A protein has these predicted regions:
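Glycine-rich phosphate-binding loop and adjoining beta1-alpha1-beta2 segment
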Residues: 47-90
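Ligand-binding beta-strand-loop-alpha-helix segment within the catalytic cores
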Residues: 74-107, 114-122
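Conserved N-terminal Rossmann-fold NAD(P)-binding element of oxidoreductases
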Residues: 28-30, 53
Length: 271
């Protein structure tokens, strides 16, 4: 085996798996506290092609938990910062970025309750795997349903805010989740749409109540970059977060993607 930056990974996965990862295209929606760590792990595992979707710019308040957030990156688009990190890790990787929020508007279709205004920008059939790391229910539903319609594997992250125990994260089918308020909503929405199964990462920890109300100071003294979309001032609730919780969720997501794409689960008989 020739030594390269992925040699240690190859020792566990094998050359065949590394080739599969190098040829895979993973679309990650949401490059924040969860999605940023997912992309980081995928890049360090040898995934060769990325589609990154996020309209947000790095904010000072992201520094406590987001891998892309540093003093020098504040004000820059998250997808641009993430692309730079990927290419610094693996110059051979191909990275496509979309500086937009995968938003939705009402639609009369029987299959889709929501239709994104930018739907034509995304051809899900070209993706090897889809990662949903957004925090908006309508966008999550649309991402999942479009992946399902194209028979593309998809994994979705449930709530990671207002939690302190990273050991409570689990991988399960959406219908076997408990405790998570977001998962409860998604169970109902997936059942309504006839979705039989959906792999998710969720936490069994009961959501904690923030000790202080940040919304007041954030609404009057917003430190987001001028003109940034979806400022904190426009959010109804601002969840508390710590570095060691959303990061773990993101790494678990990446682990599932790697094991599914590489085929190592079957060869190693992993559960």
């Amino acid at each position: 085996m020739a030594l390269n930056q992925f040699s240690r990974t190859q020792l566990l996965l094998g050359q065949e798996s590394m080739d599969l990862l190098a040829n895979a295209t993973v679309a990650v929606f949401g490059i924040g506290g969860v999605g940023g760590y997912t992309v980081e792990a995928l890049a360090r595992s040898g995934v060769g092609h990325f589609v990154l979707v996020d309209d947000d710019k790095v904010c000072l308040t992201n520094i406590n938990r987001q891998i892309i957030a540093t003093r020098s990156s504040v004000g820059k688009y998250k997808v641009d910062v993430m692309k730079e990190r990927i290419l610094d890790i693996n110059p051979k990787a191909e990275v496509e970025v979309y500086k937009c929020f995968y938003n939705a508007v009402p639609c009369v279709s029987d299959f889709f309750l929501y239709l994104p205004e930018n739907a034509d920008d995304f051809d899900f059939s070209k993706y090897s795997y889809v990662v949903d790391a957004v925090d908006t229910v309508t966008a999550k539903i649309e991402i999942i349903m479009r992946a399902k319609a194209c028979n593309v594997p998809v994994i979705s992250c449930m709530g990671a805010g207002n939690k302190l125990d990273p050991t409570k994260f689990r991988v399960a089918d959406i219908y076997k989740t408990n405790m998570c308020p977001l998962a409860k909503v998604m169970r109902r929405e997936m059942k309504k749409r006839g979705v039989k199964k959906l792999k998710v990462v969720y936490s069994e920890e009961k959501s904690l109540r923030p000790l202080e109300d940040m919304s007041i100071s954030c609404r009057t003294n917003c430190i987001c970059p001028p003109g940034a979309a979806r400022k904190c001032t426009e959010r109804r609730d601002i969840p508390g977060s710590v570095a060691f919780v959303p990061s773990v969720a993101g790494l678990i997501l990446a682990g599932e993607v790697i094991k599914d794409l590489s085929g190592v689960r079957e060869r190693r008989q992993l559960q």
